[in-house]
Amino acid sequence: YGEAPVVAKTDLFHALPDLAQPQESVTPQAMERMGQSYGYMLYSAVLESSLELNSLKLFKAADRAIAFIDKQRAMTAYDRELEVRHEVGPFHGKNMHLDILVENMGRVNYGPYLNWQRKGIDGCVMINDRFAQHNWKQYALPMTNLDQLNFEAGYEEGLPAFYQVEFNVDEPADTFLDMTGWGKGFVVVNAFNLGRFWEEGPQRRLYLPGALLKPGKNELLIFETEGKHKATVILCDTPDLGDE
């Protein structure tokens, strides 16, 4: 089907009021404690003291976290990287906004850890080697209500964001979405969650069955977390499973 253009976009922070209502607590709460099983969690706090922020450490966090200070990307950590202290910034100021987006990347379905898995942050956050006791706001983001998105809410470059792509089909047929140039996230096709993509590979293209398409206008909804995107998505006729 060739190239399909991005026709609208909005970043996660502008979209939040349409997707989730915050739940507050003194310390961050795991995804499961918020009644959620999959997707993402966003943790937000205002650092009221005037300080120079130069390190972050998350306790009992899973699986992948991106931290922002006043919407500036400060840290990205995955799996065992979450267990260590990370130098950031430094960031200076008072009333700085700390936002941590945590992705649930899957669950173990066997063995001794079956009943002990917690996603999101189930411990605390350490700032400058001190435990941060703040009024945390937690936003549960299972991404099941994307029809509520308002693409006119606003957009800032470099932030996690939603992208709307449209293309026309005469006769539905199998195709492959080439996600080269996009960072990490997932794709929804005509309200069906097609799957995840990641520039780390090895797979470069997502298989899109023709059964998910319809004659006329079709829609892709892409959520991307790394601030990496293109103006188009290419729909190809061959797969790309990466380097052999």
Residue ranges with predicted function:
Residues 74-83, 195-206:
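Aromatic-rich membrane-interfacial microdomains
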Residues 1-132, 143-153, 221, 225-228, ...:
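Carbohydrate-binding surfaces of carbohydrate-active enzymes
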Residues 69-72, 79-80, 112-114, 180, ...:
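Composition- and surface-driven signal marking solvent-exposed, interaction-prone regions
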Residues 53-68, 98, 167-190, 197-198, ...:
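Aromatic-lined ligand-binding clefts that engage carbohydrates, nucleic acids, or primary amines
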Residues 156, 160, 183-184, 193:
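C-terminal effector modules of nucleic-acid-centric enzymes and ribosome-associated factors
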Residues 37-48, 158-170, 204-206:
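Short beta-strands within extracellular/lumenal beta-sheet-rich domains
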Residues 85-97, 162-170, 205-217:
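Short, surface-exposed tryptophan/glycine-enriched loops
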Residues 176, 206-244:
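Terminal leader/tail segments of proteins
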